[in-house]
Amino acid sequence: MILFSSEIEFELRDKIKMNKLIIDGASEKIFLMIISNANIYNITHENTKINYEKLTIIINDFVLSKNIKITDINAIYINQGSGSFAGIRNSISVVKAFKVAKNIDYYCYNLDDFKDEKDLSHENIPNLCKKYKIKKNLINPAYLS
């Protein structure tokens, strides 16, 4: 049997599990979403000092509850503002730690980057980052004063 490159690519894409984690700590609630191929999971937590201090634990528990390990995450998308200074700062710190410890690439987006878009839902963020060529591993937060 001969397979053409597009068929091989399609077969490989089906076998490779793409797990994306979206973290939004800029709002009133800490929002987490996992996009795992065809499945989408999300959870929210109160945006409080206690939750900031245990953000890594919250993320790890959420990921494990979906039978995924942190090392299975291919990319992290993080809202870098505008919004809560503490939420953004803590989210960025956790994501940078994941980058250093597990070598997971991250993409810092700002909703202003996508101002001409109609669908700003969290599940669309990876596609918007790709469309607008958001650079990976670059942080430029926008805090509210």
Give the location of each predicted region.
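Short, functional N-terminal and low-complexity linear motifs
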Residues: I23-K29, V63-K66, G83
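Residue-level detector of alpha-helical recognition elements and their boundaries
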Residues: I70, S91, Y109-D113
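DPxDG-like acidic metal-binding loop motif
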Residues: A75-Q80, F85-Y106
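Oxyanion-binding and handling regions
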Residues: M1-I57, D105-S145
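Stable alpha-helical structural segments in soluble proteins, enriched in small hydrophobic residues
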Residues: F62, K66, S93-V95, K99-A101, ...
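Phosphate/pyrophosphate-binding loops at sites that engage ATP/ADP/AMP, CoA/4′-phosphopantetheine
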Residues: I59-A75
